[in-house]
Curated annotation (Swiss-Prot):
GO-annotated biological processes: NAD biosynthetic process
Lineage: Bacteria, Bacillati, Bacillota, Clostridia, Peptostreptococcales
Signal peptide feature range: none
Single GO molecular function: metal ion binding
Organism per entry: Alkaliphilus metalliredigens (strain QYMF)
PANTHER family: GLUTAMINE-DEPENDENT NAD(+) SYNTHETASE, NH 3 /GLUTAMINE-DEPENDENT NAD + SYNTHETASE
Function summary: Catalyzes the ATP-dependent amidation of deamido-NAD to form NAD. Uses ammonia as a nitrogen source.
Designated name of the protein: NH(3)-dependent NAD(+) synthetase
Keyword line: ATP-binding, Ligase, Magnesium, Metal-binding, NAD, Nucleotide-binding
């Protein structure tokens, strides 16, 4: 019952955000993960006829695409797929070639710059679509990701509103169960699908359970506490506006 009340509160909040912004609907990128699945369900409840889910594969695993489609079909949201493979390859190859000509290219930094490029291409596409249908772009970051900075600046962090940023990862799963998210999505290990074997927890160096406990004020091992505090500190710039000089 508590989840039901909170869900209705967020749905009402989504309607308020749209009304205050002068827009008429909501757009979300659906990745096939639990966070975007929950958000897709929430925005569909708020605007059954004016919500849109966009699946944006970029050299994505077929399982991710299938889970994204399953989410959209299960919740009933209007959805479309925009494949960005060619656009990604075009931008990445041109950037690499430009740096190679200047002898500045660093192969060791390709993986992270590639991952961030994918997130930013998706963001640009979502805003292009949202502008055309007079909608807000809805983010999918949860409290753990927001606190640790586990998102791409001006990528998946480039959104208008963040309806589940107050939920821990475990709460997101609880909401997913309540909202009827497909079991395949509930069972999958959290991953951005950026490269083979990539998972959120491997990349962060700690677990969502530890981060959730930390955010709830519970005791966590010193090693995990230090990792969480370090991630929060180095990602501060992602949560604020760019600095300005005092001229």
């Amino acid at each position: 019952m508590e989840i039901a009340m909170k869900v209705e509160r967020v749905v009402a909040w989504l309607r308020e955000q749209v009304e205050e912004s002068g827009t008429t609907g909501l757009v979300v990128g659906i990745s096939g993960g639990i966070d975007s699945a929950v958000v897709a369900n929430l925005i569909y409840r708020a605007f059954p006829n004016q919500s849109l889910g966009v699946i944006l594969p970029i050299r994505s695993h077929q399982d991710d695409i299938d889970d994204g489609l399953a989410v959209a079909i299960a919740c009933g949201i209007k959805h479309t797929t925009v494949n960005l493979d060619n656009e990604h390859e075009n931008v990445l190859s041109k950037a690499i070639n430009a740096l190679q000509k200047l002898e500045l290219y660093d192969e060791n930094k390709l993986r992270i710059s590639d991952a961030n490029l994918r997130a930013r291409l998706r963001m640009s596409t979502l805003y292009t679509i949202a502008n055309n249908v007079n909608s807000l772009v809805v983010g999918t970051d949860n409290a753990a990701e927001l606190h640790t900075g586990y998102f791409t600046k001006y990528g998946d962090g480039g959104v208008d509103i963040l309806p589940i940023a107050g939920l821990t990862k475990r709460e997101v799963y609880q909401w997913g169960e309540y909202l009827g998210v497909p079991q395949s999505v509930l069972n999958r290990e959290p991953s951005a699908g950026l490269w083979e074997g990539q998972t959120d927890e491997k990349e962060m160096g700690t677990t969502y359970e530890m981060i959730d406990d930390f955010l709830e004020g519970k005791e966590v091992p010193q090693k995990d506490k230090e990792i969480i505090e370090r991630l929060h500190g180095i990602s501060h710039h992602k949560r604020v506006m760019p600095p300005l000089p005092n001229i």
